[in-house]
UniProtKB/Swiss-Prot annotation:
One GO term (biological process): rRNA base methylation
Range of residues in the leader sequence: none
Biological source species: Pseudomonas entomophila (strain L48)
Record-linked SUPFAM superfamilies: S-adenosyl-L-methionine-dependent methyltransferases
Keyword Nucleus: no
Subcellular location, principal: cytoplasm
E.C. no: 2.1.1.181
Species lineage: Bacteria, Pseudomonadati, Pseudomonadota, Gammaproteobacteria, Pseudomonadales
Name recorded for this polypeptide: Ribosomal RNA large subunit methyltransferase F
Alphabetized Pfam families for the sequence: Methyltransf_10
Amino acid sequence: MTDKPTLHPRNRHQGRYDFPALIKAHPDLARFTITNPYGKPSIDFANPEAVRVFNRALLKAQYGVQHWDIPADYLCPPIPGRADYIHVLADLLAEDNAGDVPRGAQVRALDIGVGANCIYPLLGHSDYRWRFLGSDIDTTALASAKAIVQANKLDKAIGLRQQTQPKHILAGLLQADERFDVTLCNPPFHASREEATRGSQRKWKNLGKQDPKRKLPVLNFGGQNNELWCEGGEIRFVSQLVGESVQYAEQVLWFTSLVSKASNLPGIEAALKKAGVKALRIVEMGQGQKQSRMVAWSFHDDAARQAWHARRKSQA
């Protein structure tokens, strides 16, 4: 029996949350703070407004993000798990960089599906000072992300771009002269609206809050359709990303995606083999009851990846 993965060692969210520090950073959190059955301060994670205010406090206290908000009905992400993905990406880049995590604006990351919350660019820039380009098909999400970027004066660190061809992921998005050290993606994992609704209801029930007459809040469990589901579900989305990545093989060092369902891995690995990748990594991730993994692939062999890092250093 293997141990379940825990938070990455560099993750800032080890142990219990420091509620006094969070309330000091964002006093509005105090009105949502409750005492849990173990006598510890917490919030009602079934209350969307509480989750949003909690995230705002966490981003301010831990990451220096002074202004953060999202529109109603958009995903309110659990920050520790999102931070883990960033740290795993950093380890991936360190692998071919003599074990050193590359930092600074010379490192460029592409966040596919940046969302209204803009969470990955905020965390990645705060922890490693990387530059990000965030893409999305949703104009409302992009407007929200832009407001966050501008309010925090991060325009030089975080760019945003609309994918105007919603049936494509990379095609039509990237310019021929752009280079990215890594791409990241947290894909929609349901195959239909009905499946997504059932998933939200399961989470709601697990909190003991299910009420058939009550509309389910969507801030922390749901999101917009394109955030939650796509035709064919997670495996189709990631397989399409693999297929499209072939065209951009020379422009990106590592392509990556989260995969929530382990049963999808064989199909994704088959797509990667067909694409002719030179390197493949699967890294298990998890916190609490939620388990996931990052799949990463590159069309560059070991020597080419090391040369990529050397070129970036020479241009710094």
